[in-house]
């Protein structure tokens, strides 16, 4: 197995984001592309990421491969990746090789862990409200909310508008996003309102680097679904369980 990633920096943020929730991950290289799933220890956040085969500059695979890795080790390898770097992933016996080809060539070998089967929850939800937003807009808003000091974020849909609010030590911050003010790219559905953990939501925003747009879907006392759209039809889905009022 050997794959080549031209946008090594963007791809690295998949691992950086995953490590916010889990310590180990099973990487699945299949005929259609790269997949990884995970659930945080508290079972609040379920993650489902797919990067299609066409995303990769090269994708050489004889058989489907499942490779367990320590995300701490992977992030140590890729922490200094630059936008000029090209990344190669290659499996050699019981090692996975990370090669970064940029200003100079560096190769790292990491031990392969036994792959774990992630308990996949049954997700068959009809979300009353959906909206699309630029990931840069969403990320900037969450950065501001983090400074307020609250631990929960309220998502409220009303008359096609989306309101995000956080109550913290500095008071309450409310942001209105709509088609009219340019905060939303698309908006559809009915009124809904629910509360989620701010840290769980904020930790997803590292995906703003490889993703341009984000779909937000939720309902009253339903999980929040955040879909970061990736190139070539890929996606990074985060399902976050609601908090009780």
Swiss-Prot record:
InterPro entries: DNA_clamp_sf, Pr_cel_nuc_antig, Pr_cel_nuc_antig_CS, Pr_cel_nuc_antig_N. It comes from the Archaea. GO terms for biological process: leading strand elongation; regulation of DNA replication. SUPFAM superfamilies: DNA clamp. CDD domains: PCNA (cd00577). One of its GO terms (molecular function) is DNA polymerase processivity factor activity. Pfam families: PCNA_N (PF00705). Keywords: DNA replication, DNA-binding. HAMAP family: DNApol_clamp_arch. Homotrimer. The subunits circularize to form a toroid; DNA passes through its center. Replication factor C (RFC) is required to load the toroid on the DNA. NCBIfam families: PRK01115.1-3. Belongs to the PCNA family. Sliding clamp subunit that acts as a moving platform for DNA processing. Responsible for tethering the catalytic subunit of DNA polymerase and other proteins to DNA during high-speed replication. This is DNA polymerase sliding clamp 2.
